[in-house]
């Protein structure tokens, strides 16, 4: 189980790049999601705690300050740590230029995780968007 808050955007205004949704979750120990595939990119940023992200047979241990990318139609699984469960935020996006944006972040199918040097700024932006859900 998790406590989560989500902003869902139903109609994209731009074809080249658009936000689909964003949110954050504070997970309970061993809370998991998947295996599941999604139609768009989703970037997760770990705000605190630890967990694992799995794509196929590859597992990525993650901790505070790191990010992981879910690619469109990729079957993934992720799970909070038993003793130090994570809290994370996510941003789902798509569009004709989304793949270029992902590459500009230094991510691709072979590099799905990274240290996130602008994590606090990303957190502020997502939380500001979530304040406008009511």
List each language-model region with its residue ranges.
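Generic protein-terminus/edge-of-domain signal
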Residues: 1-67, 74, 82, 109-112
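Ligand-binding loop in jelly-roll beta-barrel domains
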Residues: 59, 73-97
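Alpha-helix N-cap/helix-start motif at coil-to-helix transitions, marked by capping-box chemistry
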Residues: 13-16, 37, 92, 116-123
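Amphipathic alpha-helical segments enriched in hydrophobic/aromatic residues interleaved with Lys/Arg
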Residues: 101-134
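Alpha-helix boundary/capping detector
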Residues: 45, 79, 91-94, 117, ...
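Small/polar loops that bind or transfer phosphate-bearing groups
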Residues: 70, 90, 114
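Amphipathic, well-ordered alpha-helical segments in soluble domains
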Residues: 18, 42-45, 94-97, 121-125
């Amino acid at each position: 189980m998790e406590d989560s808050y989500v902003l869902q955007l139903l109609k994209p205004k731009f074809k080249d790049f658009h936000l689909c949704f964003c949110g954050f979750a504070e997970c309970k120990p061993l809370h998991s999601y998947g295996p599941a595939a999604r139609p768009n990119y989703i970037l997760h940023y770990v705000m605190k705690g630890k967990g694992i992200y799995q794509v196929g047979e590859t597992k990525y241990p993650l901790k505070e300050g790191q990010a992981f990318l879910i690619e469109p139609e990729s079957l993934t699984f992720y799970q909070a740590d038993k003793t130090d469960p994570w809290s994370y935020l996510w941003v789902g996006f798509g569009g004709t230029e989304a793949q270029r944006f992902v590459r500009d972040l230094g991510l691709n199918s072979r590099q799905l995780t990274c240290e996130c040097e602008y994590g606090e700024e990303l957190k502020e932006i997502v939380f500001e968007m979530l304040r406008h859900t009511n």
